[in-house]
Amino acid sequence: MTYPRRRYRRRRHRPRSHLGQILRRRPWLVHPRHRYRWRRKNGIFNTRLSRTFGYTVKATTVRTPSWAVDMMRFNIDDFVPPGGGTNKISIPFEYYRIRKVKVEFWPCSPITQGDRGVGSTAVILDDNFVTKATALTYDPYVNYSSRHTIPQPFSYHSRYFTPKPVLDSTIDYFQPNNKRTQLWLRLQTSRNVDHVGLGTAFENSIYDQDYNIRVTMYVQFREFNLKDPPLKP
C-alpha cells in the first residue's frame, strides 16, 4: 500500500533555548526563591586594560634539571597612564574592582633552538608564593591542582582567572569568587592595591628563552567623577 506524497513542507518549530529545556525539566527552579533576579547595573562601567612586556629566562651551564621560579602580581597603576595637572589620576572614577585577568605567554625563541623543557604556572590567590629563585632543583608547582604545564620554549600558554586583592599581608585568606559580594576598592592617587597572582616555574636551558607576556585586565569602575582634583585624594 502506498501513501500519497505530501505536497507541502512541514513547518519547523522554533528552536528552543538550552535554558528553556532546563526549566522545563526542573520546574521548581522557576520559583521566585530560586530564579535569577535581574539587578540594575547603572553607573558601572566595564573596561579592558592591556599591557605587554618582555620576559627572559637566562641561560645556564648547569646540565642538571633546574627551574627558574618567579611570580606575577597585578596593579592597576601598571595599566593606566599617569595623569597631569592637579588631577593625579587619568581615570575619573572613584572606585574599581578587577573581575578577571588573562595572562598570555608568546614565545619568541628561534625555532632552530634545540633544547626542550617543561615549565609550570599555578594560580596563587593568598600571596603565598614560592620564593623567587634562578636555579631551583625541582618544580615547586608540580603538585598544585591549579598547575598548567608549559612545553618550552615554543608553545603558546595562557591563564584566565579571578585575581584577589592583597588587603592585609598578615592574613592567609582571600575573598570568595562571588560577583555580588566582590569588594569595591578606592582608586587612589598615590598607590593602589596589588592583586595576586600567578606563580611561574620555567625549566632552565643552555639557551636564553624569550617570551612576550601580554596581560589583559577586565576592570569595572563606578562613581564617575570629573572634579579636579578628586573629592578625597
UniProtKB/Swiss-Prot annotation:
UniProtKB keywords: Capsid protein, Clathrin- and caveolin-independent endocytosis of virus by host, DNA-binding, Host nucleus, Host-virus interaction, T=1 icosahedral capsid protein, Viral attachment to host cell, Viral penetration into host cytoplasm, Viral penetration into host nucleus, Virion, Virus endocytosis by host, Virus entry into host cell
Chain positions covered by the region annotation DNA-binding: 1-47
GO CC annotations on file: host cell; host cell cytoplasm; host cell endosome; host cell nucleus; T=1 icosahedral viral capsid
Impact reported for R63T: In strain: Isolate PCV/688
Keyword DNA-binding in record: yes
Cell compartment(s), UniProt: Host nucleus; Virion
Gene Ontology molecular function, alphabetical: DNA binding
Region of interest (Nuclear localization signals), ranges: 5-41
InterPro entries, alphabetized: Circovirus_capsid, Circovirus_capsid_sf
Consequence recorded when altering A59R: In strain: Isolate PCV/688
GO biological-process terms attached to the record: receptor-mediated endocytosis of virus by host cell; symbiont-mediated perturbation of host microtubule cytoskeleton; viral capsid assembly; viral penetration into host nucleus; virion attachment to host cell
Outcome of mutating I206K: In strain: Isolate PCV/688
Family: Belongs to the circoviridae capsid protein family.
Protein name from the UniProt record: Capsid protein
Lineage of the species this protein comes from: Viruses, Monodnaviria, Shotokuvirae, Cressdnaviricota, Arfiviricetes
Gene transcribed to yield this protein: Cap
